[in-house]
C-alpha cells in the first residue's frame, strides 16, 4: 500500500489529505485500510461492506484463499475484529447499506459492526437506505452524499492545522 500511495501522490501531486471508500468486499478493504492506517486517512466510507468476513461464507472463502486456514491470522484483516479492539484516532466512518440488499443478512451483517463500534466507543454513521439493494444504482444514488461527507472531513482537518 505504501508504494502505491507514493506513486499516486507523485503522479497526481496530492496534498496528503486522503480518504478511502469501497463497495462490498472493497468496502471491507476501505474499512480495514482506514482502521489499520489512521494517520493516512481523514475519513472512510463504504457501500454495503462485508464487515466480518471471518464469519460469513464469502469472507471465509476469500480468507482461506488469501490468508490460509489459520483463523487466528484473519483478525488483522477483519474490519469487525479491528473495530473491537481499536484504540487509535477515531476517523469518521459513513456506511450506506440498502435494506433490500439480498446479501444484507447472510454476508454483510452491518449490525455486527454497529455493535463492535458501540463496544469500542467508536462513532459510526450507518445509513440503512430503504428499498435499495447491492447494485451500482444504489452507489450512484448515494455517491454524492459520500463525497460530500469526505469533503467536509477534509475541510475540517484542514482548519485544524
Give a label for each model feature:
Residues 1-161:
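Non-catalytic cap/lid and distal C-terminal segments of serine-dependent acyl enzymes
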Amino acid at each position: 500500500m505504501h508504494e502505491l500511495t507514493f506513486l499516486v501522490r507523485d503522479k497526481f501531486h496530492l496534498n496528503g489529505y486522503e480518504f478511502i471508500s469501497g463497495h462490498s468486499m472493497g468496502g471491507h478493504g476501505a474499512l480495514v485500510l482506514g482502521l489499520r492506517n489512521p494517520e493516512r486517512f481523514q475519513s472512510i466510507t463504504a457501500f454495503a461492506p462485508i464487515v466480518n468476513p471471518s464469519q460469513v461464507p464469502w469472507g471465509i472463502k476469500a480468507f482461506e484463499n488469501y490468508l490460509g486456514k489459520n483463523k487466528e491470522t484473519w483478525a488483522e484483516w477483519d474490519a469487525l475484529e479491528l473495530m473491537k479492539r481499536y484504540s487509535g484516532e477515531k476517523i469518521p466512518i459513513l456506511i450506506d447499506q440498502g435494506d433490500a440488499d439480498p446479501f444484507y443478512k447472510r454476508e454483510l451483517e452491518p449490525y455486527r459492526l454497529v455493535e463492535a463500534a458501540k463496544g469500542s466507543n467508536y462513532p459510526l454513521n450507518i445509513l440503512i437506505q430503504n428499498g435499495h439493494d447491492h447494485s451500482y444504482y444504489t452507489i450512484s444514488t448515494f455517491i454524492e452524499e459520500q463525497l460530500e461527507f469526505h469533503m467536509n472531513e477534509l475541510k475540517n482537518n484542514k482548519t485544524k492545522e
